[in-house]
Amino acid sequence: MSAPMTTPRVSVIMPVFDAGRDLERALRSVAAQTFVDRELVIVDDGSRDPTTRALLDRAAASGAATVHRTENRGPAAARNLAIERARAPYILPLDADDWLAPRCLERTVPVLDADPAVGVVHTWVGLTGEHHGTWRTGPFEIPALLARCTVHVSSLFRREVWVRAGGFDPRFVEASEDWDFWLSAAAQGWRGHCVPDVLAYYHRGPRSRERRARLPGAANRRMQTLVAKHRALSERHLEDALGALYEELMQASTSLERIYDHPAVRLALTARDLLRGRRRET
């Protein structure tokens, strides 16, 4: 008789779509974690690329990951499916072109263990590819989150956070599903905690989803959905949110080349248009 399967402490969940060789780096980073009480759950979101499919087959055959294959529905739906199939009480999403520092789980898991009021643990993020530097994430607070996405998707959170937030919204196919998720989580009263060290890496390459999502039409549609969904939250925190927006715009204005591409500007313009529409209706 085989021994009963134990429940891991952490489920790393990964949506994959035609990631190619970037996937290999992400898989290695999970295997290199010093925190060993974990599992890796992958949802292949309809990949057609032979390299991607071969790497996933190898990961499944070796026992490094459980792989679930589905038709292409976008990363939000893929993450939701992965969490449904995951067994652990703690969840950490990892995109296939990003990776983790070896001590990421070792440094973040104890924070959730120590304080049940903390629902999300985020870390500083190393930027690679088209941008280089360090993203000092946070704060995980509603006014700041209304101004921009202050937390990277590769943050550790409790499964209960995902349940109470309603999961990742599959309407956000192009991007911002993480931003929406963090807003929903904060609205439920969850606190965040930042580990001020680079423990996750975000790679933005020429084929990255975020690059495509910054096209004006896609960005405007996404912001309209985000603002409409969280309108009540915005109204309750209007004064503080405007203060956070002001700070963001002042920081962005130091680089005029980037100001109109800044998420805070897009959000402010979308909110303005929606408010103008409301005034015309009254």
Residue ranges, per PLM feature:
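Acidic donor-binding segment of Leloir-type glycosyltransferases
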Residues: 27-69
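A conserved hydrophobic helix/loop-capping motif in glycosyltransferases and polysaccharide synthases
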Residues: 9-22, 26, 33, 43
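Glycine-rich, basic loop-to-helix element that forms the pyrophosphate-binding segment
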Residues: 70-86
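Boundary detector for helix-to-coil junctions that initiate low-complexity/charged tails
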Residues: 217-282
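Short aromatic/hydrophobic "clamp" motif used to bind/position activated sugar donors
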Residues: 91
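Acidic donor-binding loop at a coil-to-helix junction in glycosyltransferase catalytic cores
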Residues: 174-181
